[in-house]
């Protein structure tokens, strides 16, 4: 059974799935349809072009050290080959995951103690976009061996719609932060 995460909540993935070695991080979203002006009233609603992006950042001793440790639409694979971004979806069209990151936990070099997954809206300031303008937004973690969804975080369930980024962190060992 998948755990539905709330802001600030922690979950032990190894406790949920012993021997976890491969995970899929999935990001999905749909633009909220909006009506603007006279023409929109004639032709119906139109979804805003909102581009959410998933990024994985590998940390050493909890710190960011090198730009090559960032895996995203502009750098699809980590130099170790253990973290791969499967491509950029610019619109959120379609069902299910719109972007995916695959992580082979068993082969991540020992010097990395954490992987932070960041979700942001591309060019959000220029486009004046925020999470309140999207619906059905989620990030989820799936056991790569069993395809079982382990946990899911609803990005649309926000107290504040003024946010344009969010993150999930995974650690090799328990952390107090």
PLM regions: where:
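Intrinsic-disorder/low-complexity signal
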Residues: 1-162, 166-172, 177
């Amino acid at each position: 059974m998948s755990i539905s995460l709330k802001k600030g909540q922690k979950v032990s993935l190894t406790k949920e799935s012993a021997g976890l070695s491969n995970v899929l991080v999935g990001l999905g979203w749909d633009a909220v349809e909006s009506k603007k002006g006279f023409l929109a009233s004639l032709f119906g609603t139109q979804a805003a072009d909102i581009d959410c992006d998933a990024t994985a950042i590998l940390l050493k001793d909890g710190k960011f050290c090198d730009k090559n440790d960032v895996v995203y639409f502009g750098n699809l694979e980590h130099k170790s080959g253990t973290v791969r971004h499967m491509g950029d979806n610019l619109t959120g069209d379609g069902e299910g995951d719109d972007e995916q990151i695959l992580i082979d936990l068993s082969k991540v070099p020992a010097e990395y103690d954490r992987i932070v997954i960041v979700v942001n809206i591309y060019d959000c300031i220029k486009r004046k976009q925020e999470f309140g303008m999207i619906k059905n937004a989620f990030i989820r973690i799936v056991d790569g061996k069993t395809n079982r969804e382990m946990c899911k975080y609803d990005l649309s369930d926000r107290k504040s719609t003024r946010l344009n980024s969010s993150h999930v962190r995974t650690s090799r060992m328990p952390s107090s932060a």
